[in-house]
Structure formats: structure tokens, C-alpha cells
């Protein structure tokens, strides 16, 4: 069985960061070792309040050192990183990735470069973006930006269409990662009434589209974390790229539908777990080149 060291944020109530990736990945048949960069009461989009703290950067290193001390780091098949509470956390994660790859040269690094949202702008300090662009990108095997994050990683230019996004993703492939998953094309997609994703390698690219699920002004949080977790599991299990993209699009759609059906704000991962593994909907990915 595959093992993923997942270094992300954690919320006690709800599903974001590790709280959105840990259960789905286990339900999909892999072990997840959750290591939290922050621990909050709930995600920060609640207008009322949130409480909690950012974990000290040395805490992250100490935990991984403990795993190494019992001789288990070589069993780690992939490191997944998400929201960073500080730039120093990012630098520590880069060191952890190197340590894991030293213990297991076949291990992957899946970087979810959480910086912000196309509609909401950047939500992390510039120094965090700097660590992601300068340190995490070059050592990643797979990177999964949304549109804003793709623009930032590729140099800051605004991307207006799918062709430009493919070219920007290819630019990232030249800097380190073998695979770029653009989790949400947003305004650069073919259609604004659909949710669109890209999967890009140095030689090929695929596009998939699914219906948007209307939640009004209050969109669920954690969709990107769920997407990254599912994609990593599929790839670790040897699923072909096109098939993995199709499964992830359908699985996330099933979760969104169940969340809408139950009139909830938080992703209903437990209620949708069977459909997440075996989606009833199917969205065919188109190869662009």
C-alpha cells in the first residue's frame, strides 16, 4: 500500500487542507500521514471568526525527524504539500522533500502551491509566494496551481485563454515538474459556465470540463485540496493521466452535488464517499496536443 506524507493546513470543524485530503485519500486506498502546518477551528472564509495557530517551522522538521528515527521514512511514496503558514515552513518542507527522496529515490513531491484565488487575489505573504516559486517548484514532480497561481509561477503575466495556460504550464515543466495540473481555469477557460481543468506534460496536454454547481455567493472551501489529493492517489496507483483527470473531475463533481443536495457549506466527503470512489457521472478529457 502506498504512503503519502501530507503537509497542509488542518481545520477541526469542516474540510479544508488535510481535513479535505486525508479521508478521501484513505478511502481511495492509500495511507496518509497528516502533518499540519496550521491548526484552526474552521477555515478562514467564515465571516464570524476563526481561532487557532500556525505551527512553528521547527515542529514540522521535528515530526519528520521522528519518523526517520524509527526507520520509516523510506516507506513514504510521496510528499504532498499545501497551504503554508510561513515562508520558513516552506523552506523546511523543501528540506523534508529532499530527505524523503534520499530515503526513497522513487518518492514523488506533489506541490499544491496555495497562494490565492483568481477572484479573491493572493492570500499569502509575498515571501511565501517566493518560496513556492523559487524553492518548491524546481524540486516538484507534480504541481497543481489554479489560474492565479499558474500566472504567478510563470512570471506574473495575465493568462487569457487555454492555449496561453498550456504554454505557461509547459514553461513550468522546463523548471522541474513533469506534470502540471491546472485545477481551475476560471476566466481563461473555453466556457465560463463550466468548471475546467488542464493536465499538462512536456509533450501532451488534456482538457476536461464539468458543470458548475451553483452555491451562490458562498462557495465551499477545500475543493482544490480534495482535487490534489485525489489526483496524487490516482497517479500513485498507476492510473493513466487522461483517466486520472477524468476520474478526479467526476469525483469532485459528485462531492459538490452531494454537498448541494444536503444544503451544506462544508464539503460532504463522508456522505459522498462511495460516489467519490466510483462516480456515476463521466466527463471525457480531450487531448489538446
Curated annotation (Swiss-Prot):
Enzyme class of the recorded protein, top EC level: transferase
EC id: 2.7.1.35
GO biological process terms on file: pyridoxal 5'-phosphate salvage
Transmembrane segments: none
Catalytic activity from the UniProt record: pyridoxal + ATP = pyridoxal 5'-phosphate + ADP + H(+)
GO MF: ATP binding; magnesium ion binding; pyridoxal kinase activity
Regions annotated as coiled coil: none
SUPFAM superfamilies assigned: Ribokinase-like
Pfam families referenced in this protein's UniProt entry, alphabetically: Phos_pyr_kin
CDD domains, per database record: pyridoxal_pyridoxamine_kinase
Domain of life: Bacteria
Keywords, comma-separated and alphabetical: ATP-binding, Kinase, Magnesium, Nucleotide-binding, Transferase
Pathway: Cofactor metabolism; pyridoxal 5'-phosphate salvage; pyridoxal 5'-phosphate from pyridoxal: step 1/1
Complex formation: Homodimer.
Name of the protein described by the UniProt record: Pyridoxal kinase PdxY
Source species taxonomy: Bacteria, Pseudomonadati, Pseudomonadota, Gammaproteobacteria, Enterobacterales
